[in-house]
């Protein structure tokens, strides 16, 4: 499936879709944060916001998978290694917080 999508759309269009989905993930995450904090009310329920976030994450992941299987624009192994470094750095920062 990924190959057919890539063949029909091409690299630029898939990258544009990835950017659009990233924006939608950000919006859904912000909506969920508002619900969790109970500040700045929204008409969405927790379950609705969760479903929206899951859907947007799935859309984003589909774009990444299409690129991963069809394009050499990035290397997933490098991304995995970078993710490990970034996760460790994030935890280190949290553990070294003052207060």
Segments from the language model and where they lie:
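Flexible "arm" and connector segments at domain edges
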Residues: 1-57, 61-99
């Amino acid at each position: 499936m990924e190959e057919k999508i890539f063949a029909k759309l091409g690299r630029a269009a898939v990258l544009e879709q990835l950017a659009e989905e990233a924006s939608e993930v950000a919006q859904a995450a912000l909506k969920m944060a508002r619900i969790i904090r109970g500040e700045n009310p929204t008409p969405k329920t927790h379950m609705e916001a969760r479903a929206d976030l899951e859907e947007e994450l799935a859309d984003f992941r589909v774009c990444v998978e299409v690129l991963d299987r069809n394009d050499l624009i990035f290397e997933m192994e490098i991304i995995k290694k970078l993710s490990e470094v970034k996760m460790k750095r994030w935890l280190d920062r949290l553990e070294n917080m003052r207060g």
